[in-house]
Amino acid sequence: MHNLLMNSKVLVFDLDGTLYDGTEHYDYYANLLANEISSDKRNSFLNDYKKIKDYDHALTIGKIYDSENDLIISLDPITLKPIQVFTWEGQLLSKDELPENYIEKINYELPYIPVGDGWWIPLVASYHYGAKDVYHCYDKTKEYMATKEFSIPYIKGLKDALEKVKDTKKIVLLTNSDREDVTRLLKLLNLNELFHLEITDGKKPLETEKHFKNIMNKFNVKPHEIVSIGDNFINEISPALKLGMHGVYITNQTTMQVSDSLLVVKKLEEVFE
C-alpha cells in the first residue's frame, strides 16, 4: 500500500468509479440517452460523447456546463473558482462576449452542472443536443447494473488491502448514491461490512466539507491524517486539499499535479501495489 495511505488514520472512499472500474455502464447510459435525441442529431451526440471520452473536446471532467447558455466553464483546480468560458465547439470567450457579471454568478446549482465524473459526460452531451427529462435513463442503467448481464469490474487487491488495515485505520464510504444502491453494490463487490462508517446520499460537492469535518470530529483526527480517494475532483479532491487533507485522484489525466498532498493514479489498484 502506498505510503500516503499507510501514514494516514482515516481513508474516505467514493463509490462509483472508485470502488469498481470500467466504463461499460457509462456507454450503456449514453446509448439510452441517444434514443431521447432526435434522429438527425443522434450521430453527432454519439460522436461528441466519444470525443469527450478521448479528451478531444472542450468538455472534460472537472468543468461546469451551463445548460441555459450552452457554455463550458473551466475552474481553478484548488479554489474551484471559474477562470475561463468556452463555447461547446471550444472557442474561448472574452469577458466582453459574456453576459454582465457572468463569472460571478456561476455556482453548483441549475442551470450549472458540475461534470464531476463519467456519469455526467453523456448526460451533459445529451442536454446540448436537446434531451429533456431523462432521469429514467439513469434508473434503467442502474437496473442493468444489477443484472447478470453486467459484469462489475473489480479493483485488484482492494478487498485484501482494506481487510489488512481495517483494525488499524478507519475506513469510510462517502457517496451520493442512495442507501439501496450502495447496499446492492457493496454486496456485489463483496465489500460489505468493511466500512466503519457509510455516508449515503452525500450531496457532494455542496456538503463535502461538512462531511469531512464531521469525520474529523467523529474519529478525533486532524486533516492531514485523512485521505480522500475518488475519481471526482470537484466532489472529493478539491474540498479535501482545501481543508489540509490528502487526496488520491483517479483519472486518465495522470500528468496533473496541483499539490504535494495529492497522489494521481490511473487506477486505484496502483496504490495497493
Model-based region annotation:
Residues 26-34, 46, 115, 119-123, ...:
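An amphipathic alpha-helix signature
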Residues 36-50, 130-140, 193-194, 224:
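Short, surface-exposed acidic
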